[in-house]
Amino acid sequence: MSDNDSRKNLRMPEEDEVFAVVMDMLGANRVKVRCMDGVERTARIPGKMQKRIWIREDDVVLVEPWDWQDEKADITWRYEKQDADQLREEGHIQE
């Protein structure tokens, strides 16, 4: 099985979303993320993700920055480890 066979189509950011890496867990369903547009934001874990999708430090997520407060965002998607590795290989995530 070649390397290309193991690749899959991943959810990519829409125009109002950006890739981010979780840096720190703040508590109260909030995390500190480093976004690929160069901004560090406080991201909120929405209620529909709480206790269903567990987010940890160094996870790759998609965030949607708030229109009215650019230093805050909502998490919209979390990538599995192998999906995050694929994004890094393809150059979408810079460490």
From Swiss-Prot:
Disulfide bonds: none annotated. One of its GO terms (molecular function) is RNA binding. Residues 6-80 form the S1-like domain. Keywords: Initiation factor, Protein biosynthesis. It holds the Pfam family eIF-1a. PANTHER family: EIF-1A. HAMAP family: aIF_1A. Belongs to the eIF-1A family. Seems to be required for maximal rate of protein biosynthesis. Enhances ribosome dissociation into subunits and stabilizes the binding of the initiator Met-tRNA(I) to 40 S ribosomal subunits. This is Translation initiation factor 1A. It comes from Haloarcula marismortui (strain ATCC 43049 / DSM 3752 / JCM 8966 / VKM B-1809) (Halobacterium marismortui).
